[in-house]
Amino acid sequence: MMETDVRYNPGLLKLDLYCKGLRIDDSFFKEGRRGRQIMRTRAGLGSGLEAILPGELWTNIPVVESFAAKSPYLLFREDWPSDHAAPDPDEDRFVIRRDGDRELISEIRLSPKPSWYDRKTTSGKDMTKVGSLQGTYLGVYPSKVCEYWLEKPDKSNCKFCSVGLNLGVDDADDKSVQEVLEVVIAARDESGITYVDFNTGHYEGETYLDILEPYLRRVKEETGLLIGVQTPPHADLSRYHRLREMGVNRVSFCFEIWNRERFIEVCPGKHREYGLDRYLEAVRYCAEMGRSARVKTQSRVGVGPISFDPWVSNGEIIAGLEPPEDSIEAINWIT
């Protein structure tokens, strides 16, 4: 039976923090705090406090979203107990406590802040405006904001999304291939990343893959890192074979909601431009590409060394935006 007390189940605590956010006590801001700054970058669900829960669960906790102001969880910086030596003399102790009785819920560590977060590219741009660590991988949003946010008089962005709110705060609107490459190399050499995720929104004319390809090709050629792409589904499915050939390892399609009525209501732009079925067909098509690649690889076993670059197709949903049974059905379909 699953442990239902968040004090003893860090996985459940992680989910609850996603849903309720975290309030920050003034003690958190004392001089000497280490860790990654809270940045408003173009992560569609918002950007928050990068932290590590017990069990080495890396997470990003909402702290600036409005709902976090009502969170039952508070973050404190406290002295180490006399019977508990600090693991590092310079390391602060952070704990999550429940509002009201101040019951201890969990200790927590801040994700380490890499030295390159304070540097600029050779062009003079802050490296954090080009890319940022999301847990243990690098996230890059190379182009302009999703055009759903730019429509007038009425925007058609997904109703849960914060992309348009974050643009220009901690994220640059224009990033050259060279700037992205410099940040990728810094993150690889100093933060030990092995994966880079490239993300775009919707652009008129389905130009998102055209925009990404120069970045993908250069980063793969120069670093050999694993690369992921998250965009709307392209009408020409053969484009995904081209991505595979240039070294992309993962494609992801965020259809968000399985329930068709809720999809139309919550994601009006995606419904108008693509429709749920097109998202599902792209997931299915790219998954079949992966199965075909595995069969070809297996058929060559025993004939000498072979090169295998993984290929993964993902469909992504957000739990809580539809009835649980619909999300479960989506998970069963995806997996």
Feature map (PLM): residue ranges:
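Short Lys/Arg-enriched alpha/beta "domain-start" segment
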Residues: M1-P81
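Short acidic, gly/pro-rich beta-turn/loop elements at beta-sheet edges
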Residues: Y148-L150, Y208, R239, F263, ...
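Conserved strand-turn element in the central/C-terminal portion of the radical SAM core barrel
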Residues: G205, L226, Q230, H234, ...
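Alpha-helix termini
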Residues: L150, A186-E190, A287-G290
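N-terminal [4Fe-4S]-dependent radical SAM core
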Residues: N60-N157, G164-D173
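Short, electropositive alpha-helical surface patch
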Residues: L212-R217, N249-S252, G304-P310, E322-T335
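Core AdoMet radical
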Residues: S162-E182, A187-A282, K296, N314
